[in-house]
Amino acid sequence: MTTSFARNVPLADYTTLGLGGPAARFCSVASTDELIATVRDVDRSGDPLLVLGGGSNLVVADEGFAGTVIQVDSSDLSYTEVDDTVVRVRVDAGMEWDSFVARCVDEGLSGVEALSGIPGRVGATPIQNVGAYGQDISQTVVEVTVYDRAADRTRVLSAAECGFAYRTSIFKGRDRYVVCDVVFELTRSKLSRPIRYAELARSLGVSQGDQVPLADVRDAVLSLRRSKGMVLDPADPDTRSAGSFFTNPILSADEFARFTQRVAEVLGPEVTPPAYPDGDGRVKTSAAWLIERAGFPKGYGTGPVGISTKHTLALTNRGGATTADLLALAREVRAGVARVFGITLVNEPVMIGVTL
């Protein structure tokens, strides 16, 4: 098995932000075996390694990456019937995520329909426990096959071993594991899982908890995402982003009480901030709400970067931007929210060669 490498490949061409300097070496792999063999060879050489999927959740330094970048293009898929209603689907890391979701909807497999339209590839989804519109990966993942670089062997990790939490897992922020494939447990049904997200329920004209045809959910989610610039469109600069740039803060009960008091002081006692129970007494609030009320509306920004005109959480490359430009805006927003509300926002995209 021989993998060919290109040199000084601009990573801007491989990220949805359209930002990032060159990779010293770059290759694509088409199978899990080739992925593991190439990672092993790079590790033995001592070269820094970056494993790349769809580049949709990535912020790369203007200086690029002084090592080897492996783009994962493996795309095999197989089914195992558990019983008459339950199917396990094993999907290679390199398959386009939305192609997988579309296939599930077409074949009457319920469980990922609300995750339609999310850019990127399957291998990235467990890393940050991708979620939207009331569904997330942890609800359907059974196991993840990884190459353990430290032990030089493949391992199969159960969902429990993946350590899933809000937009994170044991994989995020660590380069020990390379995701090879993911197994999802889905339900044979023409109907969706119960609709949990209020905005999606309103769009569908149903109540939360109702089930509707899979295709209806997919169409509604795609429509909602397009309205927010969250479906890639080369003609729309608002889609040239890394999706949501900041995660929604999760606060302890004491932190939320202090935050509520701060909101009353700043915005008035009649203003109630968004609050969603998150277990163990914790409360999740809205990063978008914080950003807008700290003085950063949709469309904020001048020059080549700005906040999307459709979605407050998306920071966009309007054309001709650099990663330094993007980070300057992100830091301005983060500092503004901290100054007004005392909450420090956390970035959702993975940072390569830069920090916020």
Curated annotation (Swiss-Prot):
Q: Which superkingdom is the protein from?
A: Bacteria
Give the signal peptide, or none. Answer: none
Q: Name one GO molecular function term.
A: FAD binding
The pathway this protein participates in, as annotated, is: Cell wall biogenesis; peptidoglycan biosynthesis
- Give any single GO term for biological process: peptidoglycan biosynthetic process
Cite the active-site annotation. Answer: 167, 244, 348
| Keyword flag Transferase | no
- InterPro entries registered for this protein in UniProt: FAD-bd_PCMH, FAD-bd_PCMH-like_sf, FAD-bd_PCMH_sub1, FAD-bd_PCMH_sub2, MurB, MurB_C, MurB_C_sf, Oxid_FAD_bind_N
Q: What is its main location?
A: cytoplasm
- FAD-binding PCMH-type domain segment(s): 19-227
Q: Name one GO cellular component term.
A: cytosol
Check the record and name the Pfam families matching this protein: FAD_binding_4, MurB_C
According to its UniProt entry, what is the function of this protein? Cell wall formation.
Tell me the protein family, please. Belongs to the MurB family.
UniProt protein name: UDP-N-acetylenolpyruvoylglucosamine reductase
